[in-house]
């Protein structure tokens, strides 16, 4: 490749795969991301390597499974000295790298996350849209400069208005980075907090989505008994019916947050157009993991591997270089993204990488769905002990084209789903004698 592209890597937090209008959801409002789908490749079966923030981010930043990089839980005090993160590899190869928002490879509880040898020359940190950090929180400083009180706004009836929202701040900083001079190619990693709980969009967006018009979660009454069997496996919230969760209202607020994301993402893409950089910029839209959103009686995240929790959006576009308007059903792991970006940037891929580049699909040289035979996700005591008390829950997911196996190690329980006939995973075949051979083979 004679010309190394810029890379705009936009990562939301806790966004499910089924939240894009162009990919089949008529209830969301995502016209800008919809256009990105038409302009590029949407990988419809992309899976994160952990349903929890830090291990997932450690994985896609390192190209390794969380267990391999030894960074398997939220609340870690440190990040290992090895391996180097992808931004360091890119910077060493001549890229000007910027970080906006959260990094979350280490704990940010009651402290600003310490820098590692990350390769970022532009660093605008905001772990979460709270004013919990006395120094080093660029977003809170930005709100104060405009006369706002972030914590008071969060508790107000109108919530944080769009003009002071963290998603808006991220766009402002992105525009600043894109417009500044760069001696060579750049990579900008934008990590916003939404649509992460507590699900408090600005009122102006919340009013656009009627809870009564929402489809609600994927739930059957039998899910209550199924979750009771998994009660010893970590989760952030109690099992409840959709009515007890007020799930339709939560879904409306969740979609409102995604609508605001779409509007602010548009401003960044417009800046690429205005500066004449769109044609030489690879654009990535993705998330770190999903959200239960009431499915199976669950809200938030934890040690489960249902589609809403581990399957995420991944859309990649490069005008004129990648195929357009293609939806790939290939099984993809999120750590494949780091391998792909190194490949596109002509940066040598370390031999220890566990990710596999998607470049041949993006360029239309291989449009089959044969990228991977299976995908893996892990949960190794991953939730912060604040939520679990350190229960010592360990589990792994093995998902093929047709089936999903979830093993909760040492708990004596598990899940096996026939995804062709039960795509929303309500019929657990784990104890079915007719599927014993399949379970053991998986």
Identify what each model region corresponds to.
Residues 420:
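Residues forming the ATP-binding cleft of Hanks-type serine/threonine protein kinase domains
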Residues 1-408, 413-414, 423-441:
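Formylglycine-dependent sulfatase
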């Amino acid at each position: 490749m004679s010309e190394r592209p810029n890379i705009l890597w936009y990562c939301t937090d806790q966004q499910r795969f089924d939240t894009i209008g162009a990919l089949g959801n008529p209830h969301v409002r995502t016209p800008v991301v919809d256009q990105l789908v038409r302009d590029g490749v949407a990988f419809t079966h992309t899976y994160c390597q952990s349903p929890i923030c830090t291990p997932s981010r450690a994985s896609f930043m390192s190209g390794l499974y969380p267990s391999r990089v030894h960074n398997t839980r939220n609340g870690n005090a440190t990040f290992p000295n090895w391996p180097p993160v992808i931004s360091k590899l890119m910077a060493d190869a001549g890229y000007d790298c910027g970080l906006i928002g959260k990094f979350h490879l280490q704990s940010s509880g009651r402290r600003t996350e310490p820098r590692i040898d990350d390769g970022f020359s532009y660093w605008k940190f905001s772990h979460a849209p709270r004013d919990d950090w006395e120094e080093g929180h660029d977003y809170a400083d930005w709100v104060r400069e405009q006369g706002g009180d972030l914590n008071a706004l969060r508790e107000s009836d109108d919530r944080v208005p769009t003009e002071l929202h963290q998603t808006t701040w991220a766009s402002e900083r992105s525009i600043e980075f894109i417009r500044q001079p760069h001696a060579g190619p750049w990579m900008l990693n934008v990590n916003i907090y939404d649509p992460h709980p507590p699900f408090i969009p600005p009122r102006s967006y919340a009013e656009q989505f009627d809870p009564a018009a929402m489809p609600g979660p994927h739930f059957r009454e039998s899910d209550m008994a199924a979750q009771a069997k998994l009660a010893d496996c970590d989760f952030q919230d109690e099992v409840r019916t959709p009515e007890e969760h007020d799930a339709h209202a939560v879904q409306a607020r969740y979609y409102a947050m995604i609508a605001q994301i779409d509007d602010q993402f548009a401003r960044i893409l417009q800046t690429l157009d205005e500066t004449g950089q769109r044609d030489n910029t690879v654009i990535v839209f993705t998330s770190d993991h999903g959200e239960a959103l009431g499915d199976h009686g669950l809200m938030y995240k934890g040690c489960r591997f249902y589609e809403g929790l581990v399957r995420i959006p991944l859309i990649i576009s490069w005008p004129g270089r990648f195929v357009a308007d293609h939806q790939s059903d290939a099984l993809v792991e999120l750590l494949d993204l780091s391998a792909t970006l190194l490949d596109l940037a002509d940066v040598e891929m370390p031999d220890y990488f566990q990710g596999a580049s998607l470049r041949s699909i993006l360029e239309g040289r291989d449009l089959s769905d044969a990228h991977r035979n299976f995908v893996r996700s892990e949960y190794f005591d991953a939730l912060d002990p604040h939520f679990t008390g350190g229960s010592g829950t360990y589990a792994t997911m093995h998902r093929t084209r047709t089936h999903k196996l979830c093993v909760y190690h040492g708990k004596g329980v598990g899940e096996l789903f026939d995804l062709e006939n039960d795509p929303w995973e309500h019929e657990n075949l784990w104890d079915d004698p007719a599927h014993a051979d399949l379970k053991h083979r998986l």
